[in-house]
Swiss-Prot record:
The lineage of its organism: Bacteria, Pseudomonadati, Spirochaetota, Spirochaetia, Spirochaetales. One of its GO terms (molecular function) is rRNA binding. The gene is rplC. NCBIfam families: L3_bact. This is Large ribosomal subunit protein uL3. GO terms for biological process: translation.
Length: 206
């Protein structure tokens, strides 16, 4: 599966030839290198291991250094992904942005913005209680328990709690523009995460 590790720069808009304004997300790519391979004989399946963004020296342990011994001039990477079904690359090769030239739609995986502890109305889109005078609750989630049987609250019941900070994938985002010089692509619509967060862009599955 064709893919790259990139950084979400932010959102903007562009005009199409017919004058329609399209909201787009700018995703910038630092060099992505093949840092290893998985084989059927050794691992049970074949895949390429790609990495991007140099890891800070103080965070590089001896086991990590050992993984990069055979790679010349490539520093240990902070973000690493597996790419299945991608051929024609060897360890040390760079995957460039132009691989998306023939791709029309992509799936983008990122980490959603963390919202902290939130109530049921914001977290689960509950309607809340009456807003009028006399009501004793306005933003409460309502009842959470059962009757005498089973006399307990079921696990997984939607309640207030920590919101955001989860991995999320948005599928079938259209590739609007590819800028090889700036190592960036523009995709139609929004992608998960805050500005500056790292995302994985892969050729759409569907």
């Amino acid at each position: 599966m064709l893919g790259l590790i990139g950084k979400k720069v932010g959102m903007t808009q562009i005009f199409q030839k017919n004058g329609i304004v399209v909201p787009v997300t700018v995703i910038e790519f630092q060099p992505n290198y093949i840092i290893g391979k998985k084989t059927v004989d050794r691992d049970g399946y074949s895949a390429l291991i790609a990495g991007s963004v140099d890891l800070k020296g103080s965070k590089v342990s001896k086991p990590i250094k050992g993984q990069y011994k055979s790679l010349k001039d490539i520093e240990p990477k902070k973000y690493v992904i597996e790419l299945k079904g991608l051929d024609g690359y060897d360890a040390g090769d760079e995957i460039k942005v132009d691989v998306f030239k023939s791709v029309k739609y992509v799936d983008v995986t990122g980490t959603t913005k963390g919202k902290g502890f939130q109530g049921a109305m914001k977290r689960h889109n509950f309607s809340g209680g009456p807003s009028s005078h006399g009501s004793k609750f306005h933003r409460h989630l309502g009842g959470t328990g059962q009757a005498t049987t089973p006399a307990r609250t079921f696990k997984g019941t939607k309640m207030a709690g920590r919101m955001g900070g989860n991995q999320q994938t948005i599928q079938n985002l259209e590739v609007v523009l590819i800028n090889e010089e700036k190592r960036a692509i523009l995709v139609k619509g929004a992608v998960p995460g805050a500005k500056g967060s790292f995302v994985v862009v892969k050729k759409s599955k569907k």
